[in-house]
Structure formats: structure tokens, C-alpha cells
């Protein structure tokens, strides 16, 4: 399979993941957050803000996926977002609070970013 096709599919899957995470953050009841390791959480603003952020990012991933060659800046934005998220989440987990969902999210963002990077490099190398 061509790297462009794989990259496009991956970006659509990342968009779906981000949209679902965003929607879940917005609608999940606060008491349910205990399951994910966030005990004692009482406010809804930051939960909703994080949800909206994920939905906005899913739109960026969809636009990037529609034509990876037309908007390469969105590939770089995707990589930047995923690797900043990785550093933040893993740093938070290891320095501040051992919340299992934070660790899982950090690993997930790293893997998504890594695969986007590898497919983008493969795709741009094939174009030369």
C-alpha cells in the first residue's frame, strides 16, 4: 500500500479518536472520572475545554487527511501537537501524579505522532 494512502487513513483514524475523546470529555458525568484515575475532580469547565480542544484538533486532522500534499503545514501541526502532548502527559505522569489514563494518553499520543512522522517521511521520500 502507498504511504500517502496509509498516512491519509491514519489521519482519519486520529481524527476519529480525537473527536470521540473530545465528545466523551464533554458528556461523561464527573463521577465517572474516578474510573480513569481522576478522583476528587469537581469542576466541569476544564473537562469541557479539553473536549472542545480535541474536537477542534479532529477538524485539523480531517483537513490534513483530505490532501496531505496540499496542506503539509497541517502535518507539521499534527506532529507538533502529538509530541507536545507526549511531553506534557508523560512529564505530568512521572513528576506530579500517577494517573493511569495520563500515562496511556501519553503513550498513545507518542505512537500516533511517531506513525505520522514515519509515514510522512516515507511519503515525501517517495515523491522525490
Residue ranges with predicted function:
Residues 34-45, 73, 77, 98-108:
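Non-cytosolic membrane-interface motifs at loop->transmembrane helix junctions
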Residues 66-69, 87-104, 121-122:
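Membrane-helix boundary connector in multi-pass membrane proteins
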Residues 4-44:
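Membrane-helix boundary elements
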Residues 8-11, 15-18, 51-54, 75, ...:
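Residues within membrane-spanning alpha-helices of integral membrane proteins
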